[in-house]
Each structure stands twice: as structure tokens, then as C-alpha cells.
């Protein structure tokens, strides 16, 4: 393996998580180093079973020269319950990668593995930031004009008003640090914009956020149909609704792309029209490719943890790596603590 300089940002990688590990993971690291992180001095602490990972590492000299491999004896499985992973998977690649943040070996971690286990182990090993009750899963979502931040995406199926309040603060800090929005517009997801709409929890969270309106750019409620119009920068909701919104959005984007491909293959004229439109369509619709927006951060933990989609290919995983690197560079947790204070 290569000699890592002290000034290098070290990222821990769970090489065993995901549907296509370790090939997509190591290939994604290579893509990230060659295309997305060329201006940064990055190294990887790669955790996994040596008989699985080392043959793949041998194919990628750039990754091999910028990484340290750590052999682990166990793997968190996709169907492991969080409680089981906490009890029985202490020797897994996921656990060891997370623990490297606690020991100071790594500055952040990325994994395609079991979401519930990743959150449970991260909370147990790293703990939460001061004044944070529950971490939230957060990502940036493409829209008509610019990306917006959406949280929670599934960590908390049910939330208290205070948790939603904390999510709003954390989401605002994330938008400032990662999206470079100086004064992000924050809104609660609801079924209408009137103050009387929504559940009791949502209305109570609304009241809490109104009390600090001068310190946070709170814009009230936003409906799902308005999220992608650039009206707000941060959309806050519970994990159930957030997960549904994200998956429906990804499904719609995929369906539209599929329908268009079928339409332009129906006749010679359609194929010719598709050929003429292709450059403009690629330019306008490529930003909605979910692979380019892969990587959800677990906000509120005492460490930078990023979840990559379980079915990530090399491109998708590379973008998740970019998320964890950016979070470390922007010192996102320090900014969250500052905002809360």
C-alpha cells in the first residue's frame, strides 16, 4: 500500500456492504480519485475480508497507492436486525470502519451496507452531538433550479416536535456548509401551507421554529408539489414521509426516462427527433440522475457517517465518497454545534 502523508484526509470504507461489493466499492473509490477528488489529498482505510477485497484492489493501482487495507473477519448482512448487529457484529467491516473515527484513524466513513445497522452501530460507537436527541438521514435532492436538502429519510419513522426542530437546525447548517447557501430557506413538509394544517406534532414544530425565526430563515410549510420549484432550500419531515418522498421521486424520474426511450424507438421519425433532442435532453436531465446525488449523511452523530445506496454501482459510490469528503472538509459537525448554540 502507499505511504500516506499526515496532511491527508483519511476516509474509512466498508468494502463489504452493498449488492455489488467489493467490486463497485473499490471501483467507485478509483472513479472518485480519478475524477471527483483530484484537487484533494485523500486516502482510504479500507475494511473487509482480504480474500474478497485484495483481488479487486490489485486491479486498481491508484486506489492501492492511496489506501491502507485492514482485514476484518465478519460482515453485517443485509437482513441483520440492528439489535443483532450491535450484539454480534463487533468484528465486522462496518463496525471497524466506524470505530476508526472514534480512535482518530479516520475522519469519516462511507458504507453501502444495512442502513439500520449502520445507524445503530454509529450511535453506539460515536454517540450524538450535544443537544441532539436523534440523528437524521439527510441528502441533497435535485430540483428545477438548484439542489435542496431533505431530511429525515428514514432514521426516525415517528418524530417529536423537538426532533423536527433539531432537524431544521441541522439541515440549515448542512445547506450552508455543503450547498454554500448563506441563509437557507427552511420549511416543514405538510399537506398545505395554512398554519392550521397538519398533525399536532407538525404544528408544534412550526411554533418552535417561529420562535427562532430571526436566527433561522424559517418559511413555514411547503407542499410536496412545491419542493422542486426552488422555493425552499431545506425540507424537514419525519423519516416515514421523507423516505416515501425520496423513493417516489426516484421512481418517477426513472419512469419518465424509460417512457421517453420507448417513445423515440417507435418509428424512424421518432428516432430522428430523439437524435436531434439528445444533446439538450442530456444537458437538462442528467442532473436528475440519482447516481449523481447518491450519499446520505447521518446528521447529528459525533462523527461523519455517509450511507451509500445498497445497489450502488461505481459512479454512485464515487459520489457518496464525495459527500463524506465534502462533509469532512467543511467541518459540518462543528457548524451544527455552532447553529444549535
UniProtKB/Swiss-Prot annotation:
It holds the Pfam family FA_synthesis. It catalyses: a fatty acyl-[ACP] + phosphate = an acyl phosphate + holo-[ACP]. It is an enzyme of class 2 (transferase). It is found in: Cytoplasm. Its main location: cytoplasm. It comes from the Bacteria. GO terms for biological process: fatty acid biosynthetic process; phospholipid biosynthetic process. Keywords: Cytoplasm, Lipid biosynthesis, Lipid metabolism, Phospholipid biosynthesis, Phospholipid metabolism, Transferase. Pathway: Lipid metabolism; phospholipid metabolism. One of its GO terms (molecular function) is phosphate:acyl-[acyl carrier protein] acyltransferase activity. One of its GO terms (cellular component) is cytoplasm. InterPro entries: FA_synthesis, Phospholipid_synth_PlsX-like. Its EC number is 2.3.1.274. HAMAP family: PlsX. Catalyzes the reversible formation of acyl-phosphate (acyl-PO(4)) from acyl-[acyl-carrier-protein] (acyl-ACP). This enzyme utilizes acyl-ACP as fatty acyl donor, but not acyl-CoA. Homodimer. Probably interacts with PlsY. Belongs to the PlsX family. PANTHER family: FATTY ACID/PHOSPHOLIPID SYNTHESIS PROTEIN PLSX, PHOSPHATE ACYLTRANSFERASE. This is Phosphate acyltransferase. It comes from Ehrlichia ruminantium (strain Gardel).
Amino acid at each position: 500500500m502507499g505511504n500516506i502523508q499526515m496532511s491527508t484526509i483519511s476516509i474509512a470504507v466498508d468494502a463489504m456492504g452493498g449488492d455489488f461489493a467489493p467490486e463497485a466499492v473499490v471501483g467507485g473509490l478509483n472513479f472518485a480519485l480519478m475524477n471527483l477528488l483530484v484537487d484533494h489529498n485523500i486516502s482510504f482505510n479500507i475494511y473487509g475480508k482480504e480474500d474478497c477485497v485484495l483481488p479487486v484492489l490489485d486491479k486498481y493501482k491508484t486506489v492501492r497507492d492511496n489506501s491502507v487495507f485492514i482485514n476484518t473477519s465478519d460482515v453485517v448482512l443485509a437482513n441483520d436486525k440492528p439489535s443483532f448487529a450491535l450484539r454480534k457484529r463487533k468484528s465486522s467491516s462496518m463496525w471497524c470502519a466506524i470505530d476508526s473515527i472514534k480512535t482518530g484513524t479516520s475522519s469519516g466513513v462511507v458504507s453501502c451496507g444495512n442502513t439500520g445497522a449502520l445507524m445503530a452501530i454509529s450511535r453506539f460507537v460515536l454517540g450524538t452531538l450535544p443537544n441532539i436527541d436523534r440523528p437524521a438521514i439527510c441528502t441533497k435532492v435535485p430540483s428545477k433550479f438548484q439542489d435542496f436538502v431533505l431530511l429525515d429519510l428514514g432514521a426516525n419513522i415517528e418524530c417529536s416536535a423537538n426532533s423536527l426542530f433539531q432537524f431544521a437546525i441541522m439541515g440549515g447548517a448542512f445547506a450552508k456548509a455543503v450547498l454554500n447557501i448563506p441563509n437557507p430557506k427552511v420549511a416543514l413538509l405538510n399537506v398545505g401551507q395554512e398554519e392550521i394544517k397538519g398533525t399536532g406534532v407538525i404544528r408544534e414544530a412550526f411554533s418552535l421554529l417561529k420562535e427562532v425565526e430571526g436566527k433561522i430563515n424559517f418559511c413555514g410549510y411547503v407542499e410536496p408539489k412545491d419542493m422542486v420549484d426552488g422555493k425552499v432550500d431545506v425540507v424537514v419531515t419525519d423519516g416515514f414521509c421523507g423516505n416515501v418522498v425520496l423513493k417516489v421521486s426516484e421512481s418517477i424520474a426513472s419512469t419518465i426516462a424509460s417512457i421517453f426511450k420507448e417513445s423515440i424507438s417507435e418509428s424512424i421519425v421518432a428516432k430522428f427527433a430523439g437524435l436531434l433532442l439528445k444533446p439538450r435532453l442530456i444537458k437538462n436531465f442528467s442532473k436528475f440522475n440519482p447516481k449523481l446525488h447518491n450519499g446520505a449523511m447521518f446528521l447529528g452523530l459525533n462523527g461523519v457517517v455517509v450511507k451509500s445506496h445498497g445497489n450502488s454501482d461505481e459512479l454512485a459510490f464515487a459520489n457518496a465518497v464525495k459527500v463524506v469528503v465534502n462533509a469532512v472538509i467543511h467541518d459540518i459537525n462543528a457548524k451544527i454545534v455552532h447553529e444549535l448554540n
